[in-house]
Amino acid sequence: MLFLQSHVNRIVKVPKEYFWKRLRAFDKIQTLLPKTIKEVKIPDNFSNSIGDIRYVYLEKVYQGEVIERLDGFIEEKYMSYSVIDKSCLPVENYVSTVSIKKTNQDFTEVDWYGHFKAKDKDKEETVSMFKFNYNLICDNMEKQFTDSNSNI
Protein backbone atom coordinates (compact mmCIF):
# COMPACT_ATOMS: atom_id res chain seq x y z
CA MET A 1 0.00 0.00 0.00
CA LEU A 2 1.31 3.42 -0.96
CA PHE A 3 0.69 6.55 1.03
CA LEU A 4 -1.75 8.85 -0.72
CA GLN A 5 -2.43 12.53 -0.25
CA SER A 6 -5.51 14.73 -0.39
CA HIS A 7 -4.86 18.45 -0.58
CA VAL A 8 -6.99 21.57 -0.72
CA ASN A 9 -5.61 25.10 -0.94
CA ARG A 10 -8.20 27.84 -1.03
CA ILE A 11 -9.21 31.24 0.18
CA VAL A 12 -12.06 31.18 2.70
CA LYS A 13 -14.26 34.25 3.12
CA VAL A 14 -13.94 34.45 6.90
CA PRO A 15 -11.44 36.26 9.14
CA LYS A 16 -8.47 34.18 10.22
CA GLU A 17 -9.41 34.50 13.91
CA TYR A 18 -12.88 33.06 13.21
CA PHE A 19 -11.49 30.18 11.15
CA TRP A 20 -8.94 29.33 13.83
CA LYS A 21 -11.46 29.47 16.67
CA ARG A 22 -13.79 27.09 14.84
CA LEU A 23 -11.01 24.72 13.75
CA ARG A 24 -9.46 24.55 17.23
CA ALA A 25 -12.80 23.67 18.82
CA PHE A 26 -11.76 20.03 18.37
CA ASP A 27 -14.86 18.79 20.20
CA LYS A 28 -17.21 20.79 17.92
CA ILE A 29 -16.41 19.18 14.54
CA GLN A 30 -20.08 18.23 14.17
CA THR A 31 -20.96 21.92 13.76
CA LEU A 32 -18.79 22.01 10.63
CA LEU A 33 -20.10 18.74 9.13
CA PRO A 34 -23.67 18.58 10.46
CA LYS A 35 -25.06 16.38 7.66
CA THR A 36 -22.21 13.87 7.81
CA ILE A 37 -21.58 13.44 11.53
CA LYS A 38 -24.28 11.82 13.63
CA GLU A 39 -22.61 12.37 17.00
CA VAL A 40 -19.33 13.30 18.69
CA LYS A 41 -18.41 11.88 22.09
CA ILE A 42 -15.76 13.50 24.24
CA PRO A 43 -14.08 11.88 27.28
CA ASP A 44 -14.69 13.48 30.69
CA ASN A 45 -11.05 14.61 30.90
CA PHE A 46 -11.17 16.41 27.50
CA SER A 47 -9.42 19.80 27.63
CA ASN A 48 -8.95 20.66 23.92
CA SER A 49 -5.22 20.01 24.34
CA ILE A 50 -2.62 18.03 22.42
CA GLY A 51 -3.29 14.33 22.89
CA ASP A 52 -7.05 14.77 23.42
CA ILE A 53 -9.33 12.33 21.63
CA ARG A 54 -12.76 12.70 20.04
CA TYR A 55 -15.05 9.85 19.01
CA VAL A 56 -16.85 10.79 15.79
CA TYR A 57 -19.84 8.78 14.58
CA LEU A 58 -20.68 9.01 10.88
CA GLU A 59 -24.09 8.28 9.40
CA LYS A 60 -23.77 8.53 5.64
CA VAL A 61 -21.60 6.47 3.30
CA TYR A 62 -19.14 5.21 5.92
CA GLN A 63 -21.36 4.54 8.93
CA GLY A 64 -19.55 3.91 12.18
CA GLU A 65 -16.90 5.27 14.50
CA VAL A 66 -13.76 7.29 13.77
CA ILE A 67 -11.42 7.98 16.70
CA GLU A 68 -9.33 11.11 16.19
CA ARG A 69 -6.48 12.55 18.26
CA LEU A 70 -5.33 16.17 18.33
CA ASP A 71 -1.62 15.76 17.59
CA GLY A 72 -0.37 19.32 17.69
CA PHE A 73 -0.89 22.96 16.90
CA ILE A 74 0.82 26.32 16.69
CA GLU A 75 -1.67 28.92 17.88
CA GLU A 76 -3.55 30.58 14.99
CA LYS A 77 -1.29 28.97 12.36
CA TYR A 78 -1.31 25.19 12.22
CA MET A 79 -3.12 22.13 13.54
CA SER A 80 -2.51 18.41 13.09
CA TYR A 81 -4.75 15.47 13.96
CA SER A 82 -4.84 11.75 13.17
CA VAL A 83 -7.18 8.80 13.09
CA ILE A 84 -6.14 6.28 15.71
CA ASP A 85 -7.30 2.73 16.31
CA LYS A 86 -9.84 1.14 13.97
CA SER A 87 -12.02 3.33 11.79
CA CYS A 88 -15.06 2.96 9.53
CA LEU A 89 -13.19 5.00 6.90
CA PRO A 90 -11.49 3.13 4.03
CA VAL A 91 -8.01 4.27 5.15
CA GLU A 92 -5.20 3.44 7.55
CA ASN A 93 -2.58 5.70 9.14
CA TYR A 94 -4.52 8.90 8.40
CA VAL A 95 -2.79 12.13 9.45
CA SER A 96 -4.06 15.59 8.58
CA THR A 97 -2.52 19.04 8.83
CA VAL A 98 -4.26 22.36 8.40
CA SER A 99 -2.28 25.58 7.97
CA ILE A 100 -3.95 28.97 7.82
CA LYS A 101 -2.78 32.48 7.11
CA LYS A 102 -4.50 35.82 6.88
CA THR A 103 -4.76 37.27 3.39
CA ASN A 104 -6.61 40.37 4.61
CA GLN A 105 -8.97 41.14 7.48
CA ASP A 106 -11.88 39.24 5.88
CA PHE A 107 -10.17 36.31 4.13
CA THR A 108 -8.06 33.34 5.18
CA GLU A 109 -5.86 31.09 3.08
CA VAL A 110 -6.32 27.45 4.07
CA ASP A 111 -3.87 24.69 3.19
CA TRP A 112 -5.36 21.32 4.23
CA TYR A 113 -3.48 18.05 3.72
CA GLY A 114 -4.42 14.48 4.51
CA HIS A 115 -1.93 11.61 4.23
CA PHE A 116 -3.10 7.99 4.44
CA LYS A 117 -3.01 4.47 3.09
CA ALA A 118 -6.18 3.54 1.20
CA LYS A 119 -7.80 0.20 1.96
CA ASP A 120 -9.79 -1.78 -0.62
CA LYS A 121 -11.68 1.17 -2.11
CA ASP A 122 -10.67 2.95 -5.27
CA LYS A 123 -7.72 5.15 -4.36
CA GLU A 124 -8.88 8.17 -6.38
CA GLU A 125 -12.33 7.92 -4.80
CA THR A 126 -10.74 8.04 -1.35
CA VAL A 127 -8.55 11.03 -2.23
CA SER A 128 -11.62 12.80 -3.63
CA MET A 129 -13.68 12.01 -0.52
CA PHE A 130 -11.21 13.81 1.75
CA LYS A 131 -10.91 16.78 -0.62
CA PHE A 132 -14.69 17.02 -0.68
CA ASN A 133 -14.84 17.05 3.13
CA TYR A 134 -12.09 19.67 3.49
CA ASN A 135 -13.95 21.89 1.03
CA LEU A 136 -17.28 21.21 2.72
CA ILE A 137 -15.87 22.31 6.09
CA CYS A 138 -14.62 25.54 4.49
CA ASP A 139 -17.95 26.09 2.71
CA ASN A 140 -19.92 25.47 5.90
CA MET A 141 -17.66 27.82 7.84
CA GLU A 142 -18.26 30.59 5.28
CA LYS A 143 -22.01 30.04 5.39
CA GLN A 144 -22.14 29.94 9.19
CA PHE A 145 -20.03 33.09 9.43
CA THR A 146 -22.28 34.91 6.94
CA ASP A 147 -25.43 33.69 8.73
CA SER A 148 -24.13 34.77 12.15
CA ASN A 149 -23.30 38.25 10.83
CA SER A 150 -26.62 38.70 9.02
CA ASN A 151 -28.45 38.29 12.35
CA ILE A 152 -26.71 41.32 13.86
Protein language model regions, located:
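Hydrophobic ligand-binding cavity/cleft-lining segments
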Residues: M1-F46
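A short, structured loop/turn motif at beta-sheet edges
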Residues: K16-E17, D71-K77, S99-E109, S148
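Hydrophobic/aromatic beta-strand elements that line small-molecule binding cavities or substrate pockets
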Residues: V8-R10, V66-G72, Y94-K102
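A conserved amphipathic terminal alpha-helix motif
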Residues: E109, G114-I152
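Short, well-ordered strand-loop elements centered on a beta-strand within folded domains, enriched
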Residues: I50, S80-V83, Q105-G114
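Glycine-rich portal/gate segments that line the openings of hydrophobic small-molecule binding cavities
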Residues: D27, T31, V40-L89, L136, ...
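Amphipathic hydrophobic-ligand
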Residues: L2, P90-T97
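Beta-strand elements of well-folded, non-transmembrane domains
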Residues: V12-V14, D85-S87, I100-K102, F116-D120
